[in-house]
C-alpha cells in the first residue's frame, strides 16, 4: 500500500469517529517480520515516514489549509452561526506534507546482498578404453582418461552473481572438483572466476570487466562447459589459454540488439557462448589462471564477433580473436631418446606468444555447423637443440550437430574433428603436441535439470604430461551426467 493511500485510509477512519478532523501529522512504523503498521516506535520496527490527512484526490483538506488574516463574512440569513459549527483553525505556518524520500520499487530498495543469485552444475564422467593403447592415453581436458582413471567428478561449480547497483555487477565462481598439479588427491576447491563488471551507461552497452575471468580468445573457450555440446574443448584453441581464464581488465561493447541475441542463444538451448561483446580489448597477466606471474609484461587481447539473425530466425555468428605477449615456460630434467638433459630457457623474460583465431557458428536450427582455426607462434621444446624456443603452431576443429525436440526432451547428435600441431606451453618443457581426433556423440536433455552425453572418441595424441612425450592412439567410450541447479 502506498504511503499516501495509507494515510488517506487512516484519516478516513478517524473521520468516522469525529464529525470534524484536524489535519495532524502522523508517524507510522512497519514491523520487519509481520509487516504490520503501527503508530508507535518499538524494537524491530522501521519508520515509514510522517504523514498528514489528504482527501480522495490526494490534496490537503480545507481544514488543513493555513488561516488567512481576512475577517469572516457575515452569515447568510437563516445560516448557522459560527457558534453552531466547529471550524478548525490552522496554525500560522502550514502543516508539512509527507516528508520521506520517494518510495523505491523492485530491486532498488534491496540491499546488495539480497540481489545476488546462486546457481551451478555438476558433471560426473566415465571413460572406458575399448581399443588401441587407450590405457596410455592422456588429455589436458580430461584427467580421467588413462590407467585407473575412469570415473570421477569433472566439475562441481557454484556461481554467485548479481547487480550491486546500476553500474556494478559481481560474478564469483569456485570449482569444488579441482586437482592441483602434482596432487595425489582430488576435489579441491579452486577459484575459477572472481570479477566485477563496471558499466558506463544505463543501457549497459559499455563495460569493463576486472578480475579473474575468461579472456576473449576462442569462441569455444568462451562457451561455458555447462552449455558445451562436446565433452572437451579443442586443444588447438585451449592450448593458448588453458582454463580459459587469467587476471586482467577487458573492455566490452555490447549493443542492445546483439546483447539480446547473445542471451537468446543461451536461453533457447542453442549452445551460445554468452555475452562477451561484439568488440573486446584488454590486457591480462598471461601465465594462466591461478598461476603466479613470472615477468613484468602483459598480454594484450582483441576480440570481435557478431550474431546475425536472418528473416527466418536462423542465427549465424562470425568473428575473430587475437592475442600477443611473452610467456615464461617451466623446464625440468627429461630423458628422451636415451639422452638426459634439462631444456635451456634462453629467454628468461618470456618467449614470443602470439595467436590469431577465426570462428563461424551456424546454430542448430535444427542443423548446425561450428568451426574454428588458429595460427601463431609460441614456446616449444626443441629436442635436437635441447632448448625451448619460439616455433609456429596451427590447428582447429569442425563440428556438425542437429537439434531435435520431442516428447521426452531434446536430442543433439554431433560429430567433431580436431587437429593441432604446436607447443603445449602450460606443460613442463612446453613439449610439441600432435593431435588428430574424431568424436561422435549425442546429448539428451530430458529436463532442464538433467543432461546425459554418450560419445565415442578415436584419439591420436601426444602425452604431454610425461617425457619422452609419446604419441598414443586409442579408442574410448565416454559418458557424462550433468545436473543443473
Predicted stretch roles:
Residues 105-139, 143-289, 294-301, 305-312, ...:
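Outer membrane beta-barrel
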Residues 60-61, 252, 259-261, 271-275, ...:
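Flexible glycine-rich, low-complexity coil/linker segments exposed to the extracellular/periplasmic environment
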Residues 22-23, 189, 353, 435:
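Short solvent-exposed loop/turn micro-motifs enriched in small/polar/acidic residues
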Residues 11, 15, 28-33, 407-409:
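Ordered, small/hydrophobic-rich secondary-structure cores
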Residues 2-22:
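Gram-negative bacterial Sec-dependent N-terminal signal peptides
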Residues 27-29, 159, 359:
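Short, surface-exposed charged micro-motifs
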Residues 131, 144-145, 182-184, 194-201, ...:
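Outer-membrane beta-barrel pore domains
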Residues 22-137, 199, 485:
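N-terminal periplasmic/intermembrane-space "pro-region" immediately following the signal or transit peptide
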Amino acid at each position: 500500500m502506498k504511503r499516501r493511500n495509507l494515510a488517506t485510509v487512516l484519516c478516513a477512519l478517524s473521520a468516522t469517529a469525529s464529525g470534524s478532523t484536524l489535519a495532524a501529522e502522523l508517524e507510522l512504523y512497519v514491523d520487519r517480520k509481520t509487516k504490520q503498521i503501527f503508530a508507535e516506535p518499538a524494537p524491530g520496527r522501521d519508520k515509514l515516514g510522517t504523514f498528514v490527512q489528504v482527501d480522495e484526490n490526494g490534496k490537503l483538506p480545507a481544514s488543513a489549509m493555513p488561516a488567512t488574516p481576512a475577517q469572516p463574512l457575515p452569515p447568510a440569513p437563516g445560516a448557522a452561526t459560527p457558534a453552531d459549527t466547529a471550524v478548525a483553525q490552522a496554525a500560522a505556518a502550514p502543516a508539512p506534507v509527507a516528508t520521506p524520500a520517494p518510495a523505491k520499487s523492485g530491486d532498488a530498495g534491496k540491499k546488495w546482498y539480497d540481489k545476488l543469485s546462486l546457481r551451478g552444475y555438476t558433471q560426473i564422467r566415465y571413460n572406458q578404453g575399448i581399443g588401441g593403447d587407450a590405457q596410455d592415453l592422456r588429455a589436458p581436458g580430461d584427467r580421467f582418461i588413462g590407467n585407473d582413471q575412469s570415473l570421477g567428478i569433472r566439475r562441481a561449480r557454484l556461481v554467485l552473481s548479481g547487480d550491486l547497483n546500476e553500474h556494478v555487477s559481481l560474478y564469483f565462481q569456485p570449482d569444488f572438483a579441482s586437482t592441483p598439479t602434482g596432487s595425489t588427491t582430488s576435489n579441491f576447491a579452486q577459484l575459477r572466476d572472481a570479477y566485477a563488471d563496471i558499466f558506463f551507461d544505463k543501457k549497459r552497452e559499455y563495460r569493463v570487466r576486472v578480475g579473474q575471468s575468461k579472456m576473449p580468445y576462442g569462441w569455444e573457450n568462451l562457451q561455458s562447459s555447462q552449455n558445451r555440446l562436446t565433452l572437451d574443448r579443442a586443444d588447438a584453441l585451449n592450448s593458448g589459454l588453458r582454463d580459459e581464464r587469467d587476471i586482467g581488465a577487458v573492455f566490452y561493447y555490447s549493443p542492445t540488439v546483439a546483447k539480446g541475441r547473445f542471451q537468446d542463444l543461451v536461453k533457447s538451448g542453442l549452445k551460445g557462448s554468452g555475452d562477451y561483446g561484439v568488440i573486446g580489448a584488454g590486457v591480462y597477466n598471461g601465465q594462466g589462471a591461478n598461476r603466479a606471474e613470472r615477468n613484468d609484461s602483459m598480454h594484450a587481447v582483441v576480440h570481435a564477433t557478431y550474431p546475425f539473425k536472418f528473416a527466418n530466425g536462423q542465427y549465424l555468428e562470425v568473428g575473430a580473436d587475437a592475442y600477443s605477449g611473452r610467456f615464461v615456460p617451466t623446464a625440468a630434467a627429461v630423458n628422451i631418446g636415451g639422452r638426459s638433459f634439462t631444456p635451456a630457457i634462453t629467454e628468461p623474460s618470456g618467449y614470443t606468444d602470439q595467436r590469431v583465431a577465426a570462428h563461424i557458428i551456424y546454430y542448430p536450427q535444427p542443423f548446425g555447423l561450428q568451426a574454428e582455426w588458429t595460427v601463431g607462434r609460441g614456446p616449444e621444446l626443441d629436442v635436437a637443440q635441447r632448448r625451448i624456443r619460439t616455433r609456429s603452431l596451427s590447428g582447429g576443429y569442425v563440428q556438425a550437430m542437429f537439434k531435435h525436440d520431442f516428447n521426452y526432451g531434446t536430442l543433439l547428435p554431433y560429430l567433431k574433428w580436431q587437429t593441432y600441431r604446436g607447443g603445449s606451453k602450460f606443460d613442463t618443457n612446453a613439449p610439441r603436441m600432435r593431435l588428430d581426433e574424431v568424436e561422435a556423440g549425442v546429448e539428451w536433455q530430458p529436463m532442464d535439470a538433467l543432461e546425459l552425453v554418450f560419445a565415442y572418441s578415436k584419439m591420436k595424441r601426444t602425452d604431454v604430461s610425461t617425457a619422452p612425450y609419446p604419441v598414443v592412439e586409442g579408442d574410448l567410450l565416454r559418458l557424462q551426467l550433468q545436473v543443473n541447479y
